[in-house]
Design a protein with these regions (language model features):
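Generic intrinsically disordered, low-complexity segments enriched for polar/acidic and small residues
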Residues: 2, 9, 51-52, 83, ...
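N-terminal single-pass transmembrane signal-anchor helix
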Residues: 1-28
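Periplasmic/extracellular, small/polar-rich flexible segments of pilin-like filament-forming proteins
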Residues: 56-149
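Membrane-proximal N-terminal amphipathic helix
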Residues: 35-63
Length: 149
């Protein structure tokens, strides 16, 4: 009766573990990308709410970075996995941005969320998850005349 593993049995065990690793590692990476995409999509929604609330409370714009607690760089870009994925800007509407169906006239305060071209899978997934926000941009954020001092 033998009490130890043979070399063949050890080699088979190592081969099986290698096959499992080849299958499992890409799945783990995909799961991580999905989590980052979900987080980014939630952050875009929160940034839109933060900026809208800021404008409602103050009645004016500052830079986008200071109007939200979401991490946005000085250019208004949000990153997913260190890749610029979204650009958020605020401005007053120009004649080319007038949209009566959204209540946007010349000079209306608007918020724009634009997808930045990327090949990163997490970024592309985040852009798909935020499609409704991207499609509704520009967003009129000054429809009311209420100001809080």
């Amino acid at each position: 009766m033998k009490t130890a593993f043979t070399l063949i049995e050890l080699i088979f065990a190592i081969v099986i573990m290698g096959i499992l690793a080849v299958v499992a590692i890409p799945r783990l990476n995909a799961t991580r990308d999905d989590a980052q995409a979900s987080t980014a999509a939630a952050n875009v929604s929160v940034a839109v709410m933060d900026i809208t609330s800021y404008y409602t409370a103050k009645g004016f714009f500052t830079d986008v970075k200071s109007m939200s607690n979401i991490v946005i760089d000085d250019n208004g870009n949000m990153k997913v996995k260190n890749t610029d994925c979204f650009r958020i800007t605020v401005s007053n509407a120009t004649s080319s941005e007038v949209d009566p169906t959204k209540g946007i006239s010349v000079g209306s305060p608007i918020l724009k969320v634009v997808a930045i071209s990327s090949s990163d899978n997490a970024c592309l997934s985040a852009q798909r998850l935020t499609r409704s926000i991207l499609d509704s941009s520009p967003i009129n954020i000054g429809q009311g005349n209420v100001k809080f001092n």
